[in-house]
């Protein structure tokens, strides 16, 4: 009592309110100072005091006590204003959807956080004794987050997938929620409930596995005598708190010196005082003992464990520390689950630190060190790659601000900034423990229309023929409006593409086509057109070969784009290009025109790049009907493709798989192949010989005889029949040594009878080994093909095609369609084309460096009786016209009076009356659609366009005159003028001219569109000029013509003055809100389609911004419908750092599997360490040291990983617990096959210490390597089969144990519990064992007592015998803990 009085005199008197955290601190100090029992008395008094006070106060809680925060109104209003501005920018096309989502979430998150911080001061000022305030902030009930939901705002919620819903709940629970908010909050609540349930079960299972691994670990003895330890020193990254946590309660493994003075001795445990001393004296690294270094195999000693966390004293002997460790790690899992629900998965770590200006002034920095970029909200900013010094010049003072690298500078050089204005944003450090995950976000089209983009787009390599494009730089995607009309029945229409029509002129009969079949991805169109006599010829022909046009009657000219009377027409659609096959029927002249005909191949949008194939021709000589393999022998293959041509450009062909032949011969090895479903029964055996017409399955018979090879694939069976001679090799046979080679004729072939014969033909030798010992050689016949360059090209392609014009060359190239050694599979009854002769388009890159591609289109021109067909190929600067002249034998005067009875390639089918046509005039345009069976046509009605103008009294000055050069005059058919009046015929001539348009960079007000400010974009436009020099644009780029509709144009009259006006060019895209004229901003965004002297017409369009790396779906000029996917963004976001990551992450580390690419794969690292050290040190030492080092390394990194997860959640777990578990999963080694010792079999898992001891005892190297077991595997590899069987796989474990005759020594807890025996733990256990043993051993001398006891105890419990000299009476801990008290540091 006197002691207490004396101490009480020293105590400091505190007078302040105490909350939850202070209470925790107080209790821990009390336990340290007075011990457990005394503290519990004190706490009892605190409890009674608390209840007495609460009774007197009688706190109650009513709804009026929930005071809302006064500043909430304008905060919410401000956030709404910001998100409204954001919405506007999105509709102008300045930010894209992902940036918008990100920014709106951050706006609301910041608002909600600000309100949460306001909450406490608000209560303190207005009503400090408010019950809600007292309860939550004292830590009695409720936390800040819950109170915030009651009186602040509920904020952002997440949907069941864990994604944020970007509509925040603005009300709090006191005000009540609107209907929408109620539904959203139900989402969040449901996620919380589901999460809690799932995580609780997960945490429970984790605990079960952990306990299973370490259940047998008990403190068995005082000291194992190890001299090793791990070093701890306060590194720069380690906070003082972490240093404290690591050291307190451990035992020193070595003396600690400062200079020559020893301040702490070995085997002394560390208290707070000692740690403070280490910190103040800056001691050298402190070596501590950990469970890792304990030398006991299957238990642990007192000193390696250290203090027990429960009572702050050295752990007692017999305590089951393993189970405590397992539960300490598993249990927080359940708490963590509940924690997720409160944060609701809000974007954490999304807000970055800001640098603010220190005072008003001008800001200056070196502009060469920064480069422009976009922030993640889409704002323009500068990125600095190194440290940047920024000076702010005020009136009387100059401030220097240092900005770290990788930061974003949000102001411009020489800009005036105000004090506290944000001038830079520092990237949030990546050290925070949150994963980045890559998320895809799809953007859908809001309206129907036609797609355009204003930059180059590359194909993603894996979708070479698909319609997935990658954007290389920031640009806009435009959806040009137009009402699409989809027709599912293909029919003919009398109107050509780009005709202007009147709604009532459509008199199309309904004609249904019976057979619209799809074969091999090709669509057959059967077209009918009018007979001379007016009858309908409705014949349906069967096509024998898909590449052929069957032409009857007397039409002899090639007409690729127009079909005439009675001719049936078949277009092959290959992914995204159409191929028009055609052939001549020459009756008069006998020309060498092969039967198969030439196919001209032009992509849908008509753009061809360099090395594109313009036309090809399949020679029948290289056609095979059977499957087989092509070989080029020793021929060198030269790929004609340079690297730059690998990028396929908007659907033209690419040649990565096509090879050009250097040598003019290749070989084809025939074989018969049947691909059968996996379930079918085969009637022949593998490697058996069959004759011709043998039955293979129930309904298939072989066409050739030979050897049968059966190969089973995943879903089907591949059965080959290989014809050829079987040849059993003799000793001296040369052929048999090789396999898979071609042998030329003239080689001597030895038979087994030693008679020599010379080969007549090429043969192919293949070695077949049915069993391991036997093998034979199959000699297979080979078909040899010579590729003749001698095909007279003039007969294939018209001669004037092959002359060079304007740097465009056309080369004839033969391609082999299949790679060397590739097996070719023919589908039943189709022929395989081996070689294709192609016409390849090329031009000089040097002279025309800017030319991206050429445009190909078909043109038809009629003059008197001569019909000319052109394939027009234009570079951006010139037109090359190819005519195929064919005389029209039957005078064509009758037919061609009305031009419109020719049908187009992609015909239009219209219903009897389409509502949109009846209302007003429209324009028909056809486009090939993605959908193969449907044609699309787009109707532009006046509602899609609006007109701006007229401008009075201005000269037309925005067409660069010099770019218009007149080409040779080309007769073009009569056509309606643009405004519906017929243009005066000046001998029927138009001037056809080209006008290269550079896209003015899209005019934007605020946002910087990086990447394409300076690059001009060249689009080929045709401007037709009549004699008044007006310019019209029939824009063949899109297959749509925009004509004058009836006059519901919007006339927006503006005084058009040259100074303020922007020069408009045809086809230019104009964004919304851009000032074109003095009178105010543009009302809608769109594309300029018609420019008049006094006005212009804009076709409405919606811009979508896309950043580099985004994927664009669909093709340039394709018709899209509302709701189609336009763009897919891939962006990184930090996952919310709640336990949704925590628990699985811990589990993943403990089970040693890498679910996630982010977590470094520990197993690989472990194997790497193993190999290197073994290589350096040689065999016996290498294994010993290698395994040791590996295990030490991996243990430390595992502990750090697990701690990281828990710390990020704010859960404190002592390292000891984790170490015990990690020790168990890393303590095994795998015996390798290198040294076959007679003790362990290779592949056996044994303890590391046992391996080392056995190695010492045998004096022979055992080769082993360290291995990481997961906790499940570790539980199934213990010394007790009873505990394994009670964990998992009971039958398997028991059966194995019975077969091996395993003995269970019942050393752990679980085995004893299962058998109902007494468990070998508990602090009284040691005394019990010794009492039962003492009577037998009385005659021994008493002074040896200690040594004897320790040894007997070991012997009974464990079959490992180990003598330690340190167990004698001279041990530091020879008596009980009292002698130790002098080192106890209170």
Swiss-Prot record:
<keyword id="KW-0862">Zinc</keyword>
<feature type="binding site">
    <location>
        <position position="301"/>
    </location>
    <ligand>
        <name>Zn(2+)</name>
    </ligand>
</feature>
<keyword id="KW-0479">Metal-binding</keyword>
<dbReference type="GO" id="GO:0006351">
    <property type="term" value="P:DNA-templated transcription"/>
</dbReference>
<keyword id="KW-0150">Chloroplast</keyword>
<comment type="function">
    <text>DNA-dependent RNA polymerase catalyzes the transcription of DNA into RNA using the four ribonucleoside triphosphates as substrates.</text>
</comment>
<keyword id="KW-0240">DNA-directed RNA polymerase</keyword>
<dbReference type="Pfam" id="PF05000">
    <property type="entry name" value="RNA_pol_Rpb1_4"/>
</dbReference>
<dbReference type="InterPro" id="IPR007081">
    <property type="entry name" value="RNA_pol_Rpb1_5"/>
</dbReference>
<dbReference type="InterPro" id="IPR042102">
    <property type="entry name" value="RNA_pol_Rpb1_3_sf"/>
</dbReference>
<dbReference type="GO" id="GO:0009507">
    <property type="term" value="C:chloroplast"/>
</dbReference>
<dbReference type="InterPro" id="IPR007083">
    <property type="entry name" value="RNA_pol_Rpb1_4"/>
</dbReference>
<keyword id="KW-0804">Transcription</keyword>
<protein>
    <recommendedName>
        <fullName>DNA-directed RNA polymerase subunit beta''</fullName>
        <ecNumber>2.7.7.6</ecNumber>
    </recommendedName>
</protein>
<comment type="subunit">
    <text>In plastids the minimal PEP RNA polymerase catalytic core is composed of four subunits: alpha, beta, beta', and beta''. When a (nuclear-encoded) sigma factor is associated with the core the holoenzyme is formed, which can initiate transcription.</text>
</comment>
<dbReference type="InterPro" id="IPR038120">
    <property type="entry name" value="Rpb1_funnel_sf"/>
</dbReference>
<feature type="binding site">
    <location>
        <position position="294"/>
    </location>
    <ligand>
        <name>Zn(2+)</name>
    </ligand>
</feature>
<comment type="similarity">
    <text>Belongs to the RNA polymerase beta' chain family. RpoC2 subfamily.</text>
</comment>
<dbReference type="GO" id="GO:0003899">
    <property type="term" value="F:DNA-directed RNA polymerase activity"/>
</dbReference>
<keyword id="KW-0808">Transferase</keyword>
<dbReference type="InterPro" id="IPR050254">
    <property type="entry name" value="RNA_pol_beta''_euk"/>
</dbReference>
<keyword id="KW-0934">Plastid</keyword>
<dbReference type="Pfam" id="PF04998">
    <property type="entry name" value="RNA_pol_Rpb1_5"/>
</dbReference>
<feature type="binding site">
    <location>
        <position position="304"/>
    </location>
    <ligand>
        <name>Zn(2+)</name>
    </ligand>
</feature>
<keyword id="KW-0548">Nucleotidyltransferase</keyword>
<dbReference type="GO" id="GO:0005739">
    <property type="term" value="C:mitochondrion"/>
</dbReference>
<feature type="binding site">
    <location>
        <position position="224"/>
    </location>
    <ligand>
        <name>Zn(2+)</name>
    </ligand>
</feature>
<dbReference type="InterPro" id="IPR012756">
    <property type="entry name" value="DNA-dir_RpoC2_beta_pp"/>
</dbReference>
<dbReference type="GO" id="GO:0008270">
    <property type="term" value="F:zinc ion binding"/>
</dbReference>
<dbReference type="GO" id="GO:0000428">
    <property type="term" value="C:DNA-directed RNA polymerase complex"/>
</dbReference>
<dbReference type="GO" id="GO:0003677">
    <property type="term" value="F:DNA binding"/>
</dbReference>
């Amino acid at each position: 009592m006197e002691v207490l009085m004396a101490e009480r005199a020293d105590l400091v008197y505190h007078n302040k309110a105490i909350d939850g955290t202070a209470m925790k601190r107080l209790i821990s100090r009390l336990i340290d100072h007075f011990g457990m029992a005394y503290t519990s008395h004190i706490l009892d008094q605190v409890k009674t005091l608390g209840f007495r006070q609460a009774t007197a106060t009688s706190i109650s809680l009513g709804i009026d006590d929930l005071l809302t925060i006064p500043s909430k109104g304008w905060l919410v209003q401000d956030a709404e204003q910001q998100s409204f501005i954001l919405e506007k920018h999105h509709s102008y096309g300045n930010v894209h959807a992902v940036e918008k989502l990100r920014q709106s979430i951050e706006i609301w998150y910041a608002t909600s956080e600000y309100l949460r911080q306001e909450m406490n001061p608000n209560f303190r000022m207005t009503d400090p004794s408010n019950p809600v305030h007292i309860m939550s902030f004292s830590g009695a009930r409720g936390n800040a987050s819950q109170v915030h939901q009651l009186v602040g705002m509920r904020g952002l919620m997440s949907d069941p997938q864990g994604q944020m819903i970007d509509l925040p709940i603005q009300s709090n629970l006191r005000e009540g929620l609107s209907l929408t908010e109620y539904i959203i909050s139900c989402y969040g609540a449901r996620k919380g409930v589901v999460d809690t349930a799932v995580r609780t079960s997960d945490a429970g299972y984790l605990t079960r596995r952990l306990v299973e691994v370490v259940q047998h670990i008990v403190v068995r003895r005082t000291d194992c005598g190890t001299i090793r330890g791990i070093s701890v020193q306060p590194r720069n990254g380690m906070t003082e708190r972490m240093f404290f946590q690591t050291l307190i309660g451990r035992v020193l493994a070595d003396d600690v010196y400062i200079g020559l003075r020893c301040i702490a001795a070995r085997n002394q445990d560390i208290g707070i005082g000692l740690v403070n001393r280490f910190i103040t004296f800056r001691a050298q690294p402190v070596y501590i003992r950990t469970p890792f270094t304990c030398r006991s195999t299957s238990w642990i000693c007192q000193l390696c464990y250290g203090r027990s966390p429960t009572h702050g004293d050295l752990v007692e002997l017999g305590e089951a520390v393993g189970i405590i460790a397992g539960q300490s790690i598993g249990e927080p899992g359940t708490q963590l689950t509940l924690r997720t629900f409160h944060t609701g998965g809000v974007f954490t770590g999304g807000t970055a630190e800001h640098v603010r200006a220190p005072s008003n002034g001008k800001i200056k920095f070196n502009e060469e060190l920064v480069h422009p970029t976009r922030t993640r909200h889409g704002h323009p900013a500068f990125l600095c790659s190194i440290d940047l010094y920024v000076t702010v010049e005020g009136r009387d003072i100059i401030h220097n601000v240092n900005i770290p690298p990788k930061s974003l500078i949000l102001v411009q050089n020489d800009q005036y900034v105000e004090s506290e204005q944000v001038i830079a944003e520092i990237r949030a450090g990546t050290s925070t423990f949150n994963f980045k995950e890559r998320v895809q976000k799809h953007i859908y089209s809001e309206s129907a229309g036609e797609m355009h983009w204003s930059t180059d787009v590359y194909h993603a390599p894996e979708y070479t023929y698909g319609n997935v494009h990658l954007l290389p730089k920031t640009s806009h995607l435009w959806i040009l409006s137009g009402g699409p009309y989809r027709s599912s029945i293909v029919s003919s229409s009398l109107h050509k593409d780009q005709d202007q029509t009147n709604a009532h002129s459509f008199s199309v009969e309904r004609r249904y086509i019976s057979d619209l079949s799809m074969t091999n991805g090709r669509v057959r169109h059967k077209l009918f057109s009018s007979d001379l006599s007016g009858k309908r010829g409705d014949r349906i022909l069967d096509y024998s070969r898909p590449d052929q046009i069957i032409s009857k009657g007397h039409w002899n000219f090639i007409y690729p784009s127009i079909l005439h009377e009675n001719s049936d027409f078949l277009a092959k659609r290959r992914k995204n290009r159409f191929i028009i096959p055609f052939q001549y029927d020459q009756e008069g002249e006998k020309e060498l025109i092969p039967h198969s005909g030439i196919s001209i191949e032009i992509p849908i949008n008509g753009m061809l790049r360099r090395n594109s194939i313009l036309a090809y021709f399949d020679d029948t000589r290289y056609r095979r009907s059977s499957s087989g393999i092509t070989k080029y022998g020793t021929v060198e293959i030269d790929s004609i493709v340079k690297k730059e041509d690998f990028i396929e450009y908007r659907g033209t062909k690419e040649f990565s798989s096509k090879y050009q032949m250097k040598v003019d011969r290749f070989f084809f090895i025939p074989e018969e192949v049947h691909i059968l479903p996996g379930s079918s029964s085969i009637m022949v055996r593998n490697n058996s010989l069959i004759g011709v017409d043998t039955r293979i399955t129930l309904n298939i018979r072989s066409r050739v005889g030979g050897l049968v090879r059966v190969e089973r694939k995943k879903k089907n069976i591949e059965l080959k029949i290989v014809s050829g001679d079987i040849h059993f090799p003799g000793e001296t046979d040369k052929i048999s040594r090789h396999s898979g080679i071609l042998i030329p004729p003239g080689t001597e072939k030895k038979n087994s009878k030693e008679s020599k014969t010379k080969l007549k033909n090429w043969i192919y030798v293949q070695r077949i080994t049915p069993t391991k010992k036997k093998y034979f050689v199959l000699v297979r016949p080979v078909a040899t093909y010579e590729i003749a360059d001698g095909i007279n090209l003039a007969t294939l392609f018209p001669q004037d095609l092959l002359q060079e014009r304007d740097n465009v060359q056309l080369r004839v190239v033969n391609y082999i369609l299949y790679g060397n050694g590739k097996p070719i599979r023919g589908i039943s009854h189709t022929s395989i084309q081996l070689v294709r002769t192609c016409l390849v388009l090329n031009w000089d890159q040097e002279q025309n460096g800017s030319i991206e591609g050429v445009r190909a289109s078909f043109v038809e021109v009629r003059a008197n009786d001569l019909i000319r067909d052109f394939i027009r190929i234009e570079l951006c600067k010139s037109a090359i016209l190819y005519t195929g002249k064919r005389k029209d034998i039957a005078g064509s005067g009758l037919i061609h009076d009305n031009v419109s009875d020719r049908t187009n390639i992609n015909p239009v089918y219209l219903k009897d009356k389409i509502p949109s046509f009846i209302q007003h005039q429209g324009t028909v345009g056809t486009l090939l659609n993605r959908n193969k069976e449907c044609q699309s046509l787009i109707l532009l009605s006046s509602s899609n366009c609006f007109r701006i103008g007229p401008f009075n009294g201005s000269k037309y000055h925005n067409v660069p005159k010099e770019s218009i050069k007149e080409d040779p005059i080309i007769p073009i058919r009569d056509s309606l003028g643009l405004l519906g009046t017929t243009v005066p015929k000046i001998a029927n001539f138009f001037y056809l001219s080209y006008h290269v348009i550079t896209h003015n960079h899209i005019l934007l007000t605020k946002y910087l569109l990086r990447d394409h400010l300076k690059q001009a974009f060249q689009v080929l436009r045709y401007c037709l000029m009549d004699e008044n020099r007006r310019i019209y644009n029939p824009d063949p780029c899109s297959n749509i013509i925009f004509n004058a509709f009836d006059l519901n144009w919007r006339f927006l009259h503006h005084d058009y003055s040259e100074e303020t006006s922007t020069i408009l060019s045809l086809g230019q895209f104009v964004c919304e809100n851009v000032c074109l004229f003095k009178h105010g901003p543009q009302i809608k965004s769109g594309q300029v389609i018609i420019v008049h002297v006094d006005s212009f017409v804009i076709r409405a369009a919606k811009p979508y911004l896309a950043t580099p790396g985004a994927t664009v779906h669909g093709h340039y000029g394709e018709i899209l419908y509302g709701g189609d996917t336009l763009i897919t963004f891939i962006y990184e976001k930090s996952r919310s750092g709640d336990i949704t990551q925590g628990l699985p992450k811990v589990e993943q580390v403990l089970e040693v599997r890498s679910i996630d690419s982010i977590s470094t794969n520990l197993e690989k690292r472990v194997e790497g360490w193993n190999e290197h050290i073994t290589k350096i040190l040689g065999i016996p030492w290498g294994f010993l040291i290698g395994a040791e080092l590996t295990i030490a390394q991996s243990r430390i990194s595992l502990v750090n990983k697990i701690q990281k997860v828990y710390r990020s959640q704010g859960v404190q777990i002592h390292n000891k617990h984790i170490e015990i578990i990690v020790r168990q999963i890393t303590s095994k080694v795998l015996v390798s096959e290198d040294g076959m010792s007679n003790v362990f079999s290779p592949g056996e898992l044994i303890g590391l210490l046992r391996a080392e001891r056995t190695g010492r005892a045998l004096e022979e190297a055992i080769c082993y390597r360290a291995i990481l077991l997961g906790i499940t595997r570790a539980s199934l590899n213990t010394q007790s089969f009873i505990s394994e069987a009670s964990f998992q796989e009971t039958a398997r474990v028991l059966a194995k144990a019975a077969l091996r005759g395993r003995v269970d020594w019942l050393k752990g807890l679980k085995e004893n519990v299962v058998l109902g025996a007494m468990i070998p733990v508990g602090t009284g256990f040691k005394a019990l064992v010794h009492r039962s043993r003492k009577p037998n051993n009385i005659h021994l001398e008493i002074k040896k007592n200690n040594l004897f006891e320790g040894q007997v105890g070991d012997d009974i419990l464990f079959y490992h015998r180990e003598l330690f000299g340190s167990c004698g009476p001279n041990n530091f801990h020879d008596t009980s803990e009292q002698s130790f008290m002098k080192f106890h540091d209170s």
